[in-house]
From Swiss-Prot:
Lineage: superkingdom: Bacteria
SS bonds (residue pairs): none
GO MF annotation, one: acetaldehyde dehydrogenase (NAD+) activity
Lineage, highest ranks first: Bacteria, Pseudomonadati, Pseudomonadota, Gammaproteobacteria, Pseudomonadales
CDD domains per the UniProt record, alphabetical: ALDH_ACDHII_AcoD-like (cd07559)
Keyword DNA damage: no
Record: active site: 262, 301
Name used for this protein in its record: Acetaldehyde dehydrogenase
EC identifiers of the protein: 1.2.1.-
Keywords, ordered alphabetically: NAD, Oxidoreductase
InterPro entries documented for this protein: Ald_DH/histidinol_DH, Ald_DH_C, Ald_DH_CS_CYS, Ald_DH_CS_GLU, Ald_DH_N, Aldehyde_DH_dom
Induction: Induced by growth on ethanol.
GO biological process: ethanol catabolic process
Length: 506
């Protein structure tokens, strides 16, 4: 099935020519009246105009959030939970509309938005609706007349900055725990993908009290900087590049507020020789696990962009992988058969191509792809790159630097010790993949790899209730787990004496 382009006959969605900031429960124009035009990666054509917001717009959103904070924080857990469940239902009821919107905004294949991004977004709201209902404080008996009560309280007003690679899903990852915990939010989307959150707000805005959720569009150096440096937020959460994340952490330190940052990665995907003695279905699964590096066009922080294959199985296993690569269907992202879509922006498109040049200069062997994906018709102006496999070594820049595109560096190893050394030879530690039928090896390697998540005999699963976050320069904090509620709460200790007698010091 091929979905009609938005705004054309038969389309499931039509966009407005101009959107505002969402502040205090309504869309409003930017204070200075400035806008920027966003284009679709699918065809390089304009989508709509969005506010080029400034510090004044951030302050306006913070005014609305602070005005709503006390009432929302006092809203019962049951009511907050029910609102999150209604948000999940509304998302699910508008699956196709949101999936097509996300594809048009980001360029990713609609098969992914239909089956991953949007369903997972709904599920995360449901998950945290359940978590907040189940969360308990504690009471500790200090002695026979003194009790320590520990109570969860919301932080108040928090800032969130989301990336362009999974705009709606990353919004759900951050909004669900923050709202569940009783916080009001000022959120800034990436300027490359401002559309999806606007369409979502049109669908769910009536479910939340005005001021609880506010969205300010604009550029990172203007609106994002103003939000991150504001003295009126109690926490900042960010997903994006490591250099920007480092700056966010400095801003948080200056304001003495907590921060959660999910940053870059250069994830190893390790294949041991015993997989080739497994069932044919498992061998195919393992090959797919390597090709999953092209999921979302490689624009994933945990992209398994370093494939480590044991020497003894390299020829046979890579033939299975190349069969999968040759079978990848490229083309119109609105076609449900398309597996790899467009890169999210021209800037990212050019960055990836520059790394393909670097790989050639470094002497990497080209196994597949390596160039622009030339499409015809309306897609000719889109940002398409061939899924690319490069054979090389871990010292190359294409193995060490985050490319954030459909580019995988493949290398070999002799034994377990060498595999672990190569895997950990990176400044990042967000994710890793591990493929073996030896359960003891799986445990040893899983514990030895310095990464926040180690997929074992699988890859790119992102269920709620599986903690997600990085080691080293891949970030601070964890998401997609009930522990995230603690990140959006303060702990109040009530230390109560039930003894009528004085202490006796004075």
């Amino acid at each position: 099935m091929i979905y009609a382009a938005p705004g054309t006959p038969g389309a499931v969605v039509t966009f407005k020519p101009r959107y505002g900031n969402y502040i205090g429960g309504e869309f409003v124009p930017p204070v200075k009246g400035q806008y920027f035009t966003n284009t679709s990666p699918v065809n390089g054509q304009p989508i709509a105009e969005f506010p080029r917001s400034t510090a004044e717009d951030i302050d306006k959103a913070l005014d609305a959030a602070h005005a709503a904070a006390d009432a929302w924080g006092r809203t019962s857990v049951q009511e907050r939970s029910n609102i999150l469940l209604k948000i999940a239902d509304r998302i699910e009821q508008n699956l196709e509309l949101l999936a097509v919107t996300e594809t048009w905004d980001n360029g990713k294949a609609v098969r992914e938005t239909l089956n991953a991004d949007i369903p997972l977004a709904a599920d995360h709201f449901r998950y945290f609706a359940g978590c907040i209902r189940a969360q308990e404080g504690s009471a500790a008996e200090i002695n026979d007349s003194t009790v320590a009560y520990h109570i969860h309280e919301p932080l108040g007003v928090v800032g969130q900055i989301i990336p362009w690679n999974f705009p709606l899903l990353m919004a759900a990852w951050k909004l669900a725990p923050a709202l569940a915990a009783g916080n009001c939010v000022v959120l800034k989307p990436a300027e490359q993908t401002p559309l999806g959150i606007c369409v979502l707000l049109e669908l769910i805005g009536d479910l939340l009290p005005p001021g609880v959720l506010n969205v300010v569009q604009g550029f990172g150096r203007e609106a994002g900087e103003a939000l991150a440096t504001s003295k009126r937020i109690a926490k900042i959460a960010f997903t994006g590049s490591t250099p920007v994340g480092s700056h966010i952490l400095k801003c948080a330190a200056e304001s003495i507020i907590p921060s959660t940052v999910e940053l870059g990665g250069k994830s190893p995907n390790i294949y041991f020789e015993d997989i080739m003695q497994a069932e044919p279905a498992f061998i195919e699964k393992a090959a797919e696990g390597l090709v999953l590096a092209f999921f979302n066009q490689g624009e994933v922080c945990t992209c398994p962009s370093r494939a480590l294959v044991q020497e003894s199985i390299y020829p046979a296993f890579m033939e299975e992988v190349l069969k999968k690569v040759r079978a990848i269907k490229r083309g119109d992202p609105l076609d449900t058969e398309t597996m790899v879509g467009a890169q999210a922006s021209q800037q990212q498109y050019e960055k990836i191509l520059s790394y393909l040049d670097i790989a050639q200069q470094e002497g990497a062997e080209l196994l597949a792809g390596g160039s622009v994906e030339k499409l015809e018709g309306n897609l000719a102006s889109g940002y398409y790159i061939q899924p690319t496999l490069l054979k090389g070594h871990n010292g190359m820049r294409v193995f060490q630097e985050e490319i954030f595109g459909p580019v995988v560096g493949v290398t070999t190893f002799k034994d377990e010790a060498e595999a672990l050394a190569i895997a950990n030879d990176t400044e990042y530690g967000l994710g890793a993949g591990l493929w073996t039928r030896d359960i003891n090896r799986a445990y040893r390697m899983g514990r030895g790899i310095k990464a926040g998540r180690v997929w074992t005999n699988c890859y790119h699963l992102y269920p709620a209730h599986a903690a997600f976050g990085g080691y080293k320069k891949s970030g601070v904090g964890r998401e997609t787990h009930k522990m995230m509620l603690d990140h959006y709460q303060q702990t109040k200790n009530l230390l109560v004496s039930y003894d009528i007698d004085p202490l006796g010091f004075f």
